[in-house]
């Protein structure tokens, strides 16, 4: 159904300079299988509502982590064991599980990356400044085998899921890994 015509210009000024939108769970529970057509409409609605800082952390994380782990000489099998399936990204990025619902295919990662690039382009065209996931120390449990002297903490189980490990931020490996992660995120 087409929208009715706008009879007169409407202008509303926001009270706050930063207007953040979305969270990890929304991406995983509601938007995990959205395509570009759905996202384009959502991004346009964001702009109409004055959103200027949308969360843009989920789709690109597959490629960021895949490439980061490749640079640390992880096997493709170990990388696939770390990346979760679609719909589980929120729990993964919040440090609750690793690999569940996977493995994801290279084609899936490429599609997610392409979708994210389109989303970013549109958001930036509309003056938004997307918010990305930062590196906070969550790492695959398999990192302990690659770097046995690093201070990597086992986080145990969450429900019935194996949680990712946590790299101590005071360990020298933290800065090295963060630098690789941010290079890959560009």
Give the positions of each predicted feature:
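Aromatic-lined carbohydrate-binding surfaces of glycoside hydrolases
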Residues: 6-186
